[in-house]
Amino acid sequence: MIPIIVLIGRTNVGKSTLFNVLTKTRDALVANYPGITRDRQYGYCKLQSNKKIILIDTAGLDIKLNEIEKQAQAQTLIAIKEAHLILFLVNARDGLMPQEYEISKNIRKYQKKTILVINKIDGINEASKINEFYSLGFEKIQKISASHNQGINTLINRYLIPWISEKFKKKITENLYKDTELKKIAIKVAFIGRPNVGKSTLINGILKEERMITSNTPGTTLDSISTPIKYNYENYTLIDTAGASKKKKKINDFQRFSIIKTLQTIEKSNVILLIIDASLQTCHQDLSLADFIIHSGKGIVVVVNKCDLFNSVELKKIKELIKSKLKFLYFSKIHFISALYKKGIFQLFKSIKESYEDSKRKISTSTLIKTMHIAIKKHQPPIIKGRRIKLKYAHLGSSNPPKIIIHGNQVKYLSLPYKRYLINFFYKTLKIKGTPIQIQFKDNENPYVKNKN
């Protein structure tokens, strides 16, 4: 069993900053806006002697709440139940706040081991401001500045490592090794789309639990949330992302950062589910996202959600329209589903696995050369300045995505339509599905024949 530690506290006390410091990532959003973290954010923290813990960042616990914030607090209470240890963060600059008495009462209800972490001590000279936190009645207290990395080593060495050694007396190295191996081979699947297209609802349907906050309010998910699952003996990591909304003249820092993280999530994922709202059909934003995914070289599966809103005649027209607009994604499967009613959602895994396997497929040089020659025989390259462009050799430069390198004479003069013809021919002949192919042309060089000079 891997120890689970949860970070709780009011909004803007530095939970996400400490999460990022301990996990050595930027997986949690950090900015000087209260209430940015809404869902549970999971991360790994590696300690000394190969010890490893799961760290959970949570939404701030405050008094005045709107509906979404109430749901976020419910997520925090679930995280407390999951935890073996609680790091209760407070803000030294604000001093002791009334909410913190309520939070400490809630913690005691669950009878969880707790360390009070007094954050943002940098620049604080008033000892009285810090000392008043002792009235909360916690035995173990550590003063830190997460943003300045002050007191972090003491927190780890004085409290976290001894607690793990005491609580988990059995060696956890074997479990950690297994967990790391599972993490390595898990297929990372990112759920990408405009706000409110049903990304979180789809993940909840797959997980069969309310792990993501779902609401009709656009922008409910502000961060990229990763959840590991196993389906048909295959390991997956499902990544929910903030919706990539249309560009606005005014967009604050943390919304912009969420969009950036969505694009970063695409980069670090294996397969992307591009989710489209059937009731809104496709727009420029969907096409832009699709274009970005293609250029990233990631596998792509198109998911058209909310099909339950239409009758069969209407749905047929919508299918034809969407397929027409996305014809440049001819190599990708398009699924028409209802995440809310869980219709067609588990068929997605077949396409996800197919896309992933094809992206890593090793294609022999002989197969590529043979395919290229068949393509040339059916449609020869154009003639430039009285000489026909010659394509001589082809080999696989890399996989994930498949990158085919073609050598020949005057290849720099190949037209875009002919390049597209070759790409389409390779797709159809090699039966590659769900992943983009990249072709690179090199002039007059055979990589397998050395010069005899």
UniProtKB/Swiss-Prot annotation:
GO molecular function, one term: GTP binding
Domain KH-like: 361-445
Keywords, ordered alphabetically: GTP-binding, Nucleotide-binding, Repeat, Ribosome biogenesis
Domain of life: Bacteria
GO term, biological process aspect, one: ribosome biogenesis
Coiled-coil spans in chain: none
Cross-referenced SUPFAM superfamilies: P-loop containing nucleoside triphosphate hydrolases
Residues that hold GTP 2 according to the record: 193-200, 240-244, 305-308
Binding-site residues, GTP 1: 9-16, 57-61, 119-122
Pfam family, one: KH_dom-like
Keyword Oxidoreductase: no
Domain called EngA-type G: residue spans: 3-167, 187-360
UniProt subunit comment: Associates with the 50S ribosomal subunit.
Similarity-based family: Belongs to the TRAFAC class TrmE-Era-EngA-EngB-Septin-like GTPase superfamily. EngA (Der) GTPase family.
Function recorded in the entry: GTPase that plays an essential role in the late steps of ribosome biogenesis.
Protein name per Swiss-Prot or TrEMBL: GTPase Der
Organism the protein comes from: Buchnera aphidicola subsp. Acyrthosiphon pisum (strain APS) (Acyrthosiphon pisum symbiotic bacterium)
